[in-house]
Amino acid sequence: MLKKLSPQERKILIEKGTEPPFSGIYCDHSANGTYVCKQCASPLFSSDNKFHSHCGWPSFDDEINQSVQKNLDEDGARTEILCVNCGGHLGHIFYGENFTKKNQRYCVNSLSLDFLDDKKSA
């Protein structure tokens, strides 16, 4: 079942928008847990794979169990990332920036995510 989205969340997840840099609640978030899709609650990213890229959006160097679909943007310049379960737009993935050993950065809009804290689910 899909969650009812706010107008701002709809702008990101459905209309493929981008929130302003450094505006999202998860940009500097550091709690242990799982980031899930705001629209369908599918697990997407672990806090173990989150890192500070100082780019203005939450950054991860891996996804959970092939939970993210990757599509080349229409202009071919960037690769869009979507929730594999509901198709919600999450952001983009970038390669070759050398932030981590995996050498990939999932650049994700905070508005496309919810967070499940490990402490609360234990």
Predicted regions and their residues:
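A short Gly-Trp-Pro
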Residues: 2-122
